[in-house]
Swiss-Prot record:
Signal-transducing molecule. May have a common pathway with IL6ST. The soluble form inhibits the biological activity of LIF by blocking its binding to receptors on target cells. Pfam families: fn3, LIF-R_Ig-like, LIFR_D2, LIFR_N. Residues 49-138, 335-434, 435-534, 538-629, 627-719, 724-833 form the Fibronectin type-III domain. A motif (Box 1 motif) lies at residues 869-877. The modification Phosphoserine is found at residues 927, 1044. Residues 983-1005, 1066-1097 are annotated as: Disordered. Belongs to the type I cytokine receptor family. Type 2 subfamily. Glycans are attached at residues 64, 85, 131, 143, 191, 243, 303, 390, 407, 426, 445, 481, 489, 572, 652, 663, 680, 729, 787. This is Leukemia inhibitory factor receptor. GO terms for molecular function: ciliary neurotrophic factor receptor binding; cytokine binding; cytokine receptor activity; growth factor binding; leukemia inhibitory factor receptor activity.
């Protein structure tokens, strides 16, 4: 090899030198190089040399070195291998490998000389342990087996550790393959140690898939880690493959069968079938299929839940068949809890425990228990179905002679696992006795009895502590503890004393050991009545004098059971004085009263109770009662069920105090009960089952002296006050316009139910059928309340009321226990007559005063009133007849009323008063209203009669009245006032003397009708009396024109005359100015006369 290296280096050196010298001729150099290389190759093929030396070891003792032969050599090549070490050694070989002993640390020169037909060649190598590889021999599987029930593979092989000089660590790599396609399922490592000898190794693996489902393959290899070897360490080759396959031997097609697994685990089921599987179910759930070899399939279940007690079905369905199995998912046994061992009779030990969590496995898969006693090595087993939750298990273990301490171990096992619990006990301290039986009671005397019972077991070595329960009727139970020594025959006896004679007792008993572990259960109850004895005390006595004071009544109370000591048959009553002793015949029970006729001497009364055994000591009481003049009745109130009575200490009281009480409604002598209190006491609480709330009781406190009893205090009271049950009965005694006097009666004591504290009187306005006063305590401002705290007051006057008003009155009584019901009444106050008179007089007086003042004012202002409201000359502007519509008057030229146009009246109608002048016979004043036909009045109710007025022109004579009428005539409203203002007729004498004195209204002229020429004097008189003067000469007027409507048509509604007139008055529109003109004497009444001034007024 070194020669080859030299040969290769030489041409390179020559080429390099030639290149340096002849760099100019590149082509020539290249050709020369190729030629020399080819020559060198041919030369090398001819000579050759060994190369690629490689050394390995598989046991660290021998190195197996090999190299590659020179090229072109054949089988006839020999090799000489020389190793340069402390002593040169050479080996002649005909092959390319050599086994040499392992060399120590350091570098070694290896020379390999090859001898062949072409010659020889030599190669030198440097060999060191670091260039050596440690490759273990290929391992061999000795055995591969399977447990198909558990789907477990078991592997066995030999590590050949005897060939290794040193202790080494070995890593084994195990590969598990599945199916014919050899899919990798598991690759694990297994560590062992080489210890200088051949060792068999075992490895097992539980498949997640039943081994029946598919073929499984296993192969292994190893890796040796030696601390003393510095070379390269490599894996060995894989061992030959071993396989496991299932050979069908039954009709079973689904695996695994009846598998028990842990809840929450994953499991694979498979179906080995020649038919195609269509579906798979676990319970009611479909599962996806996993295809294996052929038609075999599998399903994977993850995190399986707890199954029912009968298991969970797994079903595979093919076209023609159904195959299946059952799976049981549960838990391993829990550690036994509350393990306890005790004994009832020191013959058997009972160990009990709580199994803890339910495993959900029953039947053959249920948990089995084994109780092992380690000192003796004995054990007992329990195998049973799974217990319900919280149920305790028990195992009986027979006690061993002369052994008191036991060490128990309780083992629990089921297909999923194991658990255990231990306990160490001294059994004599863990005794839980049986329930005592055959419990009996027998009399010893009236105050002692004997108890006997049976307790199974041999307790001769221990002592018992027994508790006896003693209970009397209506009394607190009593416990007594007794210690007794244990016996072998199980019969026990004990005596009880300090009992009461003639008393019904109830007994029961339970026992425990003196060291105490547990009480036994109580025995059955046993009732027993003790025997009688003489009464231990005399009866409690009291006496009362009869109402006539001649007989003394003696009372006594029945003796309580604890003092009677038996059934009382009779009583002996006797009375004695300094002079004599008097005894009564025996008084049979249950009579507790006797009456003796005594005089006023002092006697001592004795009462003795007797039963079948003997008599009681006598009870004595004095008959004399010491008077007490300074005695007041007091009030007391109880507190709940009793009443507290107190008094001052009195050293004169030598014996005791007696408190007597009774219902106050009972007749004399009053006695319900009594109580005696020691003489050094100053208070007591009286309680009785007969006390009732709201009932008044009388209490009497007596003090005892040698010579008799003295009444110290007299009290009335209630155990509890209540509100009255009835309302006070009240009436109205008197009623006035502003007050009401009411009076009420006392409430009976039985209905009062407490001490009366006052009355509440409500009053307010209200009617009988209204609800205004229904709620009395609502705080209404219109309801007044009077609180009457003086209970002696029986009347009340309510003042400041309104007259003729209805009032609602309510009266209620109250105690400290509450307010009683109400009694109501409605009362109406009387009417106030003074007020009525005043109410009438005041308006009348006001009216009179107003009238007088008005009259005085009117009289003083009569001139102003006349001028203002009714002047002598009315203002035409105020005349209603002249108030025309402005628009009509201004907008029409046909209206010519009061216009100064020349016209000649056709006819004049004169309205005048009666006078001395002759009347015009053929001239009449026509009232248009009166003469209007009824049908026209209905058709035109608002039409007015219009008369024409036109002041004549003196200078001009109108020849043609018709033309004037045709030209238009002014019209004036005319009203007939003749009947309204007709004056009273005067005697003819007065008429002759004053022909015009009664005229009220005068027309513009007054002309005689019969003669056109009158006496001048008469004419002057007429002029003087006339109230209105026409503006023109009256002599020129035509009174009646031949062409007037009146002369033409007597039924015409149009009446015309020359002078205007007022339609609302009969006075002259223009009165005379001279003072000498005669004045109207008021021949007729008119409104103006009311305002005329009288000169004599």
């Amino acid at each position: 090899m070194m020669d080859i290296y030299v040969c290769l280096k030489r041409p390179s050196w020559m080429v390099d030198n030639k290149r340096m010298r002849t760099a100019s001729n590149f082509q020539w150099l290249l050709s020369t190089f190729i030629l020399l290389y080819l020559m060198n190759q041919v030369n090398s093929q001819k000579k050759g040399a060994p190369h690629d030396l490689k050394c390995v070891t598989n046991n660290l003792q021998v190195w197996n070195c090999s190299w590659k032969a020179p090229s072109g050599t054949g089988r006839g090549t020999d090799y000489e291998v020389c190793i340069e070490n402390r002593s040169r050694s050479c080996y002649q070989l005909e092959k390319t490998s050599i086994k040499i002993p392992a060399l120590s640390h350091g570098d070694y020169e290896i020379t390999i000389n090859s001898l062949h037909d072409f010659g020889s060649s030599t190669s030198k190598f440097t060999l060191n342990e670091q260039n050596v590889s440690l490759i273990p021999d290929t391992p061999e599987i000795l055995n591969l087996s399977a447990d198909f029930s558990t789907s477990t593979l078991y592997l066995k092989w030999n590590d050949r550790g005897s060939v290794f000089p040193h202790r080494s660590n070995v890593i084994w790599e195990i590969k598990v393959l599945r199916k014919e396609s050899m899919e990798l399922v598991k690759l694990v490592t297994h560590n062992t140690t080489l210890n200088g000898k051949d060792t068999l190794h075992h490895w097992s693996w539980a498949s997640d898939m039943p081994l029946e489902c598919a073929i499984h393959f296993v192969e292994i290899r190893c890796y040796i880690d030696n601390l003393h070897f510095s070379g390269l360490e490599e894996w060995s080759d894989w061992s030959p493959v071993k396989n496991i396959s299932w050979i069908p031997d039954s009709q079973t097609k689904v695996f695994p069968q009846d598998k028990v697994i842990l809840v929450g685990s994953d499991i694979t089921f498979c179906c080995v079938s020649q038919e195609k599987v269509l579906s798979a179910l676990i319970g009611h759930t479909n599962c996806p299929l996993i295809h294996l070899d052929g038609e075999n399939v599998a399903i994977k279940i993850r995190n399986i839940s707890v199954s029912a007690s009968s298991g969970t079905n797994v079903v595979f369905t093919t076209e023609d068949n159904i195959f299946g199995t059952v799976i049981f998912a549960g838990y391993p046994p829990d550690t036994p809890q509350q393990l306890n061992c005790e004994t009832h009779d020191l013959k058997e030990i009972i160990c009990s425990w709580n199994p803890g969590r339910v495993t959900a496995l029953v039947g053959p898969r249920a948990t089995s228990y084994t109780l092992v006693e380690s000192f003796s090595g004995k054990y007992v087993r329990l195998k049973r179905a799974e217990a319900p939750t919280n149920e305790s298990y028990q195992l009986l273990f027979q006690m061993l002679p002369n052994q008191e301490i036991y060490n128990f171990t309780l083992n629990a096992h089921n297909p999923l696992g194991r658990s255990q619990s231990t306990i160490l006990v001294n059994i004599t301290e863990k005794v839980y006795p049986h329930t005592p039986t055959s419990f009996k009671v027998k009399d010893i005397n009236s105050t002692a009895v004997k108890l006997s019972w049976h307790l199974p077991g041999n307790f001769a070595k221990i002592n018992f502590l027994c508790e006896i329960e003693i209970k009397k009727s209506n009394s607190v139970q009593e416990q007594r503890n007794v210690t007794i020594k244990g016996v072998e025959n199980s019969s026990y006896l004990v005596a009880l004393d300090k009992l009461n004679p003639y008393t019904l007792y109830t007994f029961r008993i339970r026992c425990s050991t003196e060291t105490f572990w547990k009480w036994s259960k109580w025995s059955n109850k046993k009732q027993h009545l003790t025997t009688e004895a003489s009464p231990s005390k005399g009866p409690d006595t009291w006496r009362e004098w009869s109402s006539d004071g001649k007989n003394l009544i003696i009372y006594w109370k029945p003796l309580p059971i604890n003092e009677a000591n038996g059934k009382i048959l009779s009583y002996n009553v006797s009375c004695s004085s300094d002079e004599e002793t008097q005894s009564l015949s025996e008084i049979p029970d249950p009579q507790h009263k006797a009456e003796i006729r005594l005089d006023k001497n002092d006697y001592i009364i004795s009462v003795v109770a007797k039963n079948s055994v003997g008599s009681s000591p006598p009870s004595k009481i004095a008959s004399m009662e010491i008077p007490n003049d300074d005695l007041k009745i007091e009030q007391v109130v109880g507190m709940g069920k009793g009443i507290l009575l107190t008094w001052h200490y009195d050293p004169n009281m030598t014996c005791d105090y007696v408190i007597k009480w009774c219902n106050s409604s009972r007749s004399e002598p009053c006695l319900m009960d009594w109580r005696k209190v020691p003489s050094n006491s100053t208070e007591t609480v009286i309680e009785s089952d007969e006390f009732r709330p709201g009932i008044r009781y009388n209490f009497f406190l007596y003090g005892c002296r040698n010579q008799g009893y003295q009444l110290l205090r007299s009290m009335i009271g209630y155990i509890e006050e209540l509100a009255p049950i009835v309302a006070p009965n009240f009436t109205v005694e008197d009623t006035s316009a502003d007050s009401i006097l009411v009076k009420w009666e006392d409430i009976p004591v039985e209905e009062l139910r407490g001490f009366l504290r006052g009355y509440l009187f409500y009053f307010g306005k209200g009617e009988r059928d209204t609800s205004k006063m229904r709620v009395l305590e609502s705080g209404r401002s219109d309801i007044k309340v009077k609180n009457i705290t003086d209970i002696s007051q029986k009347t009340l006057r309510i003042a400041d009321l309104q007259g003729k008003t209805s009032y609602h009155l309510v009266l209620r009584a109250y105690t400290d226990g509450g307010v009683g019901p109400e009694k109501s009444m409605y009362v109406v106050t009387k009417e106030n007559s003074v007020g009525l008179i005043i109410a009438i007089l005041i308006p009348v007086a006001v009216a009179v005063i107003v009238g007088v003042v008005t009259s005085i004012l009117c009289y003083r202002k009569r001139e102003w009133i006349k001028e203002t409201f009714y002047p002598d000359i009315p203002n035409p502007e105020n005349c209603k007849a002249l108030q025309f519509q402005k628009s009509v008057c201004e907008g029409s030229s046909a209206l010519k009323t009061l216009e100064m146009n020349p016209c000649t009246p056709n006819n004049v109608e004169v309205l005048e008063t009666r006078s001395a002048f002759p009347k015009i016979e053929d001239t009449e004043i026509i009232s248009p209203v009166a003469e209007r036909p009824e049908d026209r009045s209905d058709a035109e109710p608002e039409n007015h009669v219009v008369v024409s007025y036109c002041p004549p022109i003196i200078e001009e004579e109108i020849p043609n009245p018709a033309a004037d009428e045709a030209g238009g005539t002014a019209q004036v409203i005319y009203i007939d006032v003749q009947s309204m203002y007709q004056p009273q007729a005067k005697p003819e004498e007065e008429q002759e003397n004053d022909p015009v004195g009664g005229a009220g209204y005068k027309p513009q002229m007054h002309l005689p009708i019969n003669s056109t020429v009158e006496d001048i004097a008469a004419e002057e008189d007429l002029d003087k009396t006339a109230g209105y003067r026409p503006q023109a000469n009256v002599n020129t007027w035509n009174l009646v024109s031949p062409d007037s409507p009146r002369s033409i048509d007597s039924n015409s509604e149009i009446v015309s005359f020359g002078s205007p007139c007022s339609i609302n008055s009969r006075q002259f529109l223009i009165p005379p100015k001279d003072e000498d003109s005669p004045k109207s004497n008021g021949g007729g009444w008119s409104f103006t006369n009311f305002f005329q001034n009288k000169p004599n007024d």
